[in-house]
């Protein structure tokens, strides 16, 4: 899921992704936005 959070590194996506999917969330930074996925 791509969320509307700007990023330059995946670390910036860690908290919003965990808020979305809980502790087992994965995160990437793609094209300046966070992408979250369930592991």
From Swiss-Prot:
Family listed: Belongs to the short scorpion toxin superfamily. Potassium channel inhibitor family. Alpha-KTx 02 subfamily.
Disulfide partners: 7-29, 13-34, 17-36
Subcellular location: Secreted
Protein name (database record): Potassium channel toxin alpha-KTx 2.16
Free-text note regarding domains: Has the structural arrangement of an alpha-helix connected to a beta-sheet by disulfide bonds (CSalpha/beta).
Miscellaneous: Negative results: does not block voltage-gated potassium channel Kv1.1/KCNA1 or the Shaker IR (with inactivation domain removed).
Domain of life: Eukaryota
Molecular function terms, GO-annotated: ion channel inhibitor activity; potassium channel regulator activity; toxin activity
Chain positions with Isoleucine amide modification: 39
Keywords: Amidation, Disulfide bond, Ion channel impairing toxin, Neurotoxin, Potassium channel impairing toxin, Secreted, Toxin, Voltage-gated potassium channel impairing toxin
Expression tissues: Expressed by the venom gland.
Main location: secreted
Biological function: Blocks human voltage-gated potassium channels Kv1.2/KCNA2 (IC(50)=0.7 nM), Kv1.3/KCNA3 (IC(50)=26.2 nM) and blocks intermediate conductance calcium-activated potassium channel KCa3.1/KCNN4 (IC(50)=56 nM).
Site (Aromatic residue of the functional dyad): 37
Organism: Centruroides tecomanus (Scorpion)
């Amino acid at each position: 899921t791509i969320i509307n959070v700007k990023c330059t590194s995946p670390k910036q996506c860690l908290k919003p992704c965990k808020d979305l999917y809980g502790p087992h969330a994965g995160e990437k930074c793609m094209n300046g936005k966070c992408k979250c996925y369930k592991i």
